[in-house]
UniProtKB/Swiss-Prot annotation:
Catalytic activity as recorded in UniProt: alpha-D-glucosamine 1-phosphate + acetyl-CoA = N-acetyl-alpha-D-glucosamine 1-phosphate + CoA + H(+); N-acetyl-alpha-D-glucosamine 1-phosphate + UTP + H(+) = UDP-N-acetyl-alpha-D-glucosamine + diphosphate
Binding site for acetyl-CoA: A388, N394, Y395, S413, A431, R448
Quaternary organization: Homotrimer.
Keyword Acyltransferase in annotation: yes
Region of interest (Linker), residue spans: 238-258
Keywords of this entry: Acyltransferase, Cell shape, Cell wall biogenesis/degradation, Cytoplasm, Magnesium, Metal-binding, Multifunctional enzyme, Nucleotidyltransferase, Peptidoglycan synthesis, Repeat, Transferase
GO biological process, one term: UDP-N-acetylglucosamine biosynthetic process
Protein name: Bifunctional protein GlmU
UniProt record similarity statement: In the N-terminal section; belongs to the N-acetylglucosamine-1-phosphate uridyltransferase family. In the C-terminal section; belongs to the transferase hexapeptide repeat family.
Enzyme class: transferase
Stated role: Catalyzes the last two sequential reactions in the de novo biosynthetic pathway for UDP-N-acetylglucosamine (UDP-GlcNAc). The C-terminal domain catalyzes the transfer of acetyl group from acetyl coenzyme A to glucosamine-1-phosphate (GlcN-1-P) to produce N-acetylglucosamine-1-phosphate (GlcNAc-1-P), which is converted into UDP-GlcNAc by the transfer of uridine 5-monophosphate (from uridine 5-triphosphate), a reaction catalyzed by the N-terminal domain.
EC number: 2.7.7.23, 2.3.1.157
Length: 488
């Protein structure tokens, strides 16, 4: 989306509590595709070239400010506080100081409209310029317009006023064209007219919509109809879920058009900001979170969950693998049912198999841990083999200790490596060993008790049991009385 070449500022209204969410968290902090609701209108305004963007905060102001600053650290954001939520006009007035000295159009958006596209904002801004109107506003047509302010047009078909539902007559309530809550207003007119807005309405609030009849007299109002899906706000958990599904659907479509195979878009879930390379294949029920990057030709299997993971080209992620803050090099094979925890670094062509957990450890090229192992705080050399059931005992109750396994080393099944410990290159560790001392390169280490085999033990034990049973038989039998016979 090309940025506008003329000055443009924006105000995003994000002060409300959102009581219908029934949450202790401010409404605009609830997430769609991994981002706070307010992130999206702010980002769209930035994409259009708005600078500055003033976010009006109120309920949980510090949390909202922190979330947006973290999500958009380089953006020209300013924050204004609306101490009391007295209406939309009052909220816009709270931004006046932050825009002191600015002259030009001001885009005003609601913080709970995540589905707005930058093209839609551009249409609203451009409509005002083309019509030389003091105000341009977005409208939408709804089959059931309950809860929205109705747009009343004049004889020439231009927006003349907006009537909130609680103040509307029966005839006005029948109107299906409603206010979308998106405006572009000249800054000078905005501050001048807002000072005249009163509270003569059913809610006793300062309505921003009162600006429309004032602007109609001052220089006209341009109306732009926009898709209802984009402009509808999120007010409860049902609408939040719908918005999330639409946003994820848009992301899936963009990936597919860029050469990614998503086998079932309806069962695909990802966050805004995820990257996927061409010819990657994403199987059903995969979840990609945070800043995850999936390389070209990588295949992610059913049920995998990846959060802030970096996967190179040609990686195979088998079903139900969980990856968090880890990186995987080209050609590596993971899973099924493997877990990479923060700090895991899997080298090229390495294998991490089923029920293997890796934390803060690096596997070199071609290293393999194919089954049932825990590798924590470990450095594993290229070509090393980690047998099933191997554990690095990295925690001594006070600190984490490292394990180093050299290139080409072979660790037998069910081995316990008590850190800190180092296994040299090419060394062998016998299955079932518990090791506490270093193993030199090329050596064989055995850390288990010697096997003892007792031939004939089973027969001897059975004979002893039989003799014991005879010695402890019924008292009558021991006294020489005839034993009772069973009828045949």
């Amino acid at each position: 989306m090309p940025r506008t070449r003329t000055p443009l500022a924006a105000i995003v209204l994000a002060a409300g509590k959102g009581t219908r969410m029934k949450s202790n968290k401010a409404k605009v902090l609830h997430e769609v595709a991994g981002r706070p609701l307010a992130y999206y209108p702010v980002k769209r305004a930035l994409e259009l070239g708005a600078s500055p963007v003033v976010v009006v905060v109120g309920h949980q102001a510090e949390a909202v400010e922190a979330a947006l600053s973290a999500a958009l650290p380089e953006a020209p954001l300013r924050f204004a506080v609306q101490e009391q939520q007295l209406g939309t006009a009052h909220a816009v007035l709270a931004a006046k100081r932050a825009l002191r000295g600015y002259r030009g159009p001001v885009l005003i958006l609601s913080g709970d409209t995540p589905l707005l596209r930058a093209e839609t904002l551009e249409a609203v801004v451009s409509a005002g310029r083309r019509a030389r109107a003091a105000v341009s506003l977005a409208t939408m047509t709804l089959e059931v317009p309950r809860g929205y302010g109705r747009v009343v047009r004049d004889a020439r078909g231009r927006p003349a006023r907006i009537v909130e539902e609680k103040d509307a007559t029966e005839a006005e309530r029948a109107v299906r064209e409603v206010n979308a809550g998106l405006y572009c207003v000249d800054a000078e007119l905005l501050w001048k007219k807002l000072a005249k807005v009163g509270t003569a309405n059913a809610q006793r609030e300062f309505y921003l919509t009162d600006l429309v009849p004032m602007a109609a007299q001052a220089g006209g109002v341009a109306g732009v109809e926009v898709p209802a899906e984009e402009a509808s706000g999120v007010n409860d958990r049902v609408e939040l879920s719908r918005a999330n599904r639409v946003m994820v659907g848009r992301l899936a479509e963009a990936f597919m058009r860029a050469g990614v195979t998503i086998e079932d878009p309806a069962r695909f879930d990802c966050d805004e900001g995820v990257e996927i390379g061409a010819d990657a294949v994403i199987e059903p029920n995969v979840r990609l979170r945070g800043r995850t990057r999936v390389g070209a030709r990588t295949r992610v299997g059913v049920g995998a969950v990846i959060t802030d993971g970096v996967l190179a080209d040609g990686v195979t992620v088998n079903p139900y693998t969980v990856i968090s803050e880890a990186q995987v090099a080209e050609g590596a094979i993971l899973g099924p049912f493997s877990r990479l925890r923060p700090g895991a670094d899997i080298g090229p062509e390495a294998h991490v198999g089923n029920f293997v957990e890796v934390k803060k450890s690096r596997l070199g090229k071609g290293a393999k841990a194919n089954h049932l192992a825990y590798l924590g705080d470990a450095e594993i050399g290229a070509g090393a083999n980690i047998g099933a059931g191997t554990i690095t005992c990295n925690y001594d109750g006070e600190r984490k200790n490292p394990t180093r396994i050299g290139e080409g080393a072979f660790i037998g099944s069910d081995s316990i490596l008590v850190a800190p410990i180092e296994i040299g290159a090419g060394a062998y560790v016998a299955a079932g060993s518990t090791l506490t001392d270093p193993v030199p390169a090329g050596a064989l280490a055995l850390g288990r008790a010697r096997q003892v085999t007792k031939e004939g033990w089973v027969a001897q034990r059975q004979a002893e049991k039989q003799m014991k049973g005879t010695a402890t038989g019924p008292a009558s039998a021991r006294k020489g009385r005839p034993a009772a016979r069973r009828a045949s």
